[in-house]
Swiss-Prot record:
This is Uncharacterized protein R549. It comes from Acanthamoeba polyphaga mimivirus (APMV).
């Protein structure tokens, strides 16, 4: 199978793309975090998106409205060249080139595929100094949670290829190279076994899940939370955060924004959405079944996660009169919503 080089041309001053981890996206059509995050992505109007651990053809991603790329589609590994044209301060048009290298780690962790991959990778990485930035995009491996003696040999073999791959990256990348991946089991697995031979750091951009993270093991808080040091993958201040990464390139810099949701933000978005939907539903002559479904979903999510208490606690720093007035409004809205749904 040939491994192609795709090309994209973008002419604008600021190029924007996002990276999200869609590992459980098939299960996330009713997930509130997923719904909020995808709305934020659509509102930000990105030029293209990188999907890790999910298909770009997933039906729940089709309304995002920009080109999508993933390391799990069609080819085991391939590259994308983005030609970014922008206007300089002197009014002249200038072009930077950005290279994306997509790697399906699940496929290359196999003796029959790895040698061919290394040969291909060394060819496409050879000219990285000709590019403004290089992004290496990797999906995660599926590592079982219940490791026992029967699958330990398979895990050791997998770990061998993951370690070799990471050391290959460290031997070939430059300071303008970034690795895009997720806070996932395979890095944790490598760190547990400690088989990485270097003591350098990679420019890792690790994307948290776009859905509710409350049951996941490893989480990303910010850009400095993770780094390689003596073969160990260090995690600091882990929280159950949901979100995605937005990357903006202007004429000089790459800016990385970690768009994560905490429950306070979620409570504000959900409560305000309920107020807007409820007012629209009451004022409409034709009762919209979609709005009613959304109100029912919001009501259930509010009850299950105690969002009203979280919302009210955030109002406590207001003056007393303002606090009680806003609390009364929220209580009245919830009573009205409950009565509507009964």
């Amino acid at each position: 199978m040939s491994n192609p080089c795709l090309t994209m041309n973008i002419t604008k001053d600021n190029l924007k793309f996002f990276v999200l981890n869609g590992k459980y996206i098939l299960e996330s059509n009713n997930d509130m975090m997923f719904a909020i995050n995808t709305k934020r992505i659509i509102a930000d109007k990105y030029d293209f998106g990188i999907i890790i651990n999910s298909s770009i053809y997933n039906k729940y991603l089709q309304n995002i409205g920009c080109p999508l790329y993933s390391p799990t589609e069609i080819f085991n590994y391939y590259q994308l060249i983005v030609n970014h044209q922008f206007t300089q301060a002197d009014g002249k048009l200038f072009e930077d080139r950005i290279k994306f290298i997509f790697v399906n780690l699940e496929t290359i962790c196999d003796r029959s595929n790895y040698t061919d991959f290394v040969s291909w990778y060394l060819t496409v990485i050879d000219d990285i100094d000709n590019y403004k930035n290089v992004f290496i995009v990797i999906n995660e491996l599926n590592v079982q949670d219940d490791i026992d003696s029967e699958n330990m040999d398979d895990l050791d073999d997998m770990d061998h290829y993951v370690s070799n791959f990471l050391n290959l990256l460290l031997a070939t990348v430059n300071k303008n190279t970034y690795v895009l991946s997720s806070d996932s089991e395979y890095f944790a697995h490598v760190s547990l076994y400690g088989k990485i031979s270097c003591d350098e750091s990679l420019n890792m951009i690790l994307c948290g899940n776009i859905f509710d993270n409350s049951d996941c093991k490893y989480f990303l808080t910010n850009g400095t939370s993770y780094k390689f040091f003596n073969g160990y993958f260090v995690i600091h201040r882990s929280d159950n955060l949901s979100g995605f990464v937005g990357i903006t390139k202007d004429s000089k810099n790459i800016n990385i924004d970690y768009h994560y949701l905490n429950m306070l933000t979620v409570s504000q978005i959900v409560v305000h959405s309920v107020i807007r939907l409820l007012e629209g539903y009451k004022s409409s002559d034709k009762k919209n079944e979609v709005d009613l479904y959304l109100l029912r979903s919001y009501h259930s999510y509010i009850e299950q996660n105690g969002l009203i208490s979280i919302y009210k606690n955030n109002l406590a720093n207001k003056n007393i009169r303002s606090y009680f007035l806003k609390c009364k409004v929220i209580d009245d809205v919830m009573i009205e919503l409950t009565n509507l749904l009964e």
